[in-house]
């Protein structure tokens, strides 16, 4: 039995009844039953208070009579269940990703203990995480979450412990974990778990789980660098993953001297909803600009859209990120298939939504300050009718009266008109229109989520699309332009292979070994590692950096397209024995093209959204100042 399979069997031993516990005792008399109840209630309250106090001391590292390194064993000991629950409540709200949750736990507790005690903690953590983040593929079964957490702990050890006697490739990790999950629930959503496990693997590979140090141990070395034990390589990969700074190199973004950035913790969708439920102010997702005060409360602008719509919700089954992160699979293709015109895989590929009208729900939606607010209504009265003046209600009244309320942060989202709106005639009898909002994969509880909204007309759909893309462009981090590791691996298009080295003989293709191309980071994986911090940039810097980034991506696309004819010429002129290598090389080329093109299309949408907002602001100023406009006409 493998370690992953044993995850389900690591439980505390069943309690045995002692002879004393098996003896029947006299039932209480009615005269003192109230006294017993009161004593029991008082004892329960005292127990809760004591458990909270002990949990707080463990969190602070000040619990007496228990060694700091024994806290986990103490929490997992039978009889300390209430203390464990209170300790985990101190970690609320839990991150929406399981790796983020484990990272938060191991940053708050010295998480080395006996297997049974660790298992008890993970079981309680699984229950709490699932109650806060009810992701569909977990089937409301905490045991599935428990298995994944245990698997990630094992993976963390094998990836970062030099003395470990085994190691997992990403394929082995996924296969072993899926097998363990299927033994618990045979009908699990394998594609969803595969995507999540792939992202978890890369997250832990880039940065191991922290090991909490006692309060007396310094967190920083004399050099000023944090002593996290990860080493320079891990830190370098993490910097590439987060891309929170504009590195001044030829392959990165260059900020102006006047650019401004503020580093803050990223507010997750779970945190936003937690704050809303508890009537706490939401965290700012952007830096205020002077024009925000003028336009942020003006409905029908890139700054604010608020209206009644119909909404459908769906999850993406596939995206190119999961394809790029998956293991290479050789496809059966004919040699000449690569000469066909390539079909662009853009961000505008639409999700399959159910056409049944019963799936539509009435909702008031509001896009404002980097967030999407959704108030769903089921109807009122016997006829289940929807009041016509909901759009005039205060937000607090909407929150109290709606059947369901949720707020979503717009990091990395893309809004687009549904294709049927674009091709429909303006004189058509169809008055309504639809638009989509797609959330990136790997981003907290919204991973792969997609909404379809039906508006009153096409103009309103366009306004919602522009507003969503404006805020996404403004708050989303811009990744590094470097898309692959600098290495000596051959993918099928290196200058050495296509042109030959100067003064040397042509490369023997029979001896060429092609590696599987994959990006330095997945299309959306940048968002999954942003629990620790994110840089907020002023508007001009974000706009300027988007221009630089899209230009760099465009240049890389042109450069990549230029090598394809050379590859075809090199490989196609050889005999049939080279066909497998030719197909592998073209598969690599295609994967890189899809990656670059998708990044380019997405950030081009962001760039246009910010530029259109600038034009809108300039027009609004000219309307507000007609005297200036008339004076300009007189001078001309």
Curated annotation (Swiss-Prot):
It is found in: Cytoplasm; Cell membrane; Bud neck; Bud tip. Keywords: Cell membrane, Cytoplasm, Guanine-nucleotide releasing factor, Membrane. One of its GO terms (molecular function) is guanyl-nucleotide exchange factor activity. GO terms for cellular component: cellular bud neck; cellular bud tip; cytoplasm; plasma membrane. It comes from the Eukaryota. Residues 333-475 form the PH domain. The keyword Ribosomal protein does not apply. GO terms for biological process: regulation of ARF protein signal transduction. Its main location: cytoplasm. The keyword Cell membrane applies. Residues 1-29, 213-234 are annotated as: Disordered. InterPro entries: PH_GEF_YEL1, Sec7_C_sf, Sec7_dom, Sec7_dom_sf. It is a peripheral membrane protein. Guanine nucleotide exchange factor for ARF3 required for localization of ARF3 to the bud neck and tip and involved in actin patch polarization. Belongs to the YEL1 family. This is Guanine-nucleotide exchange factor YEL1.
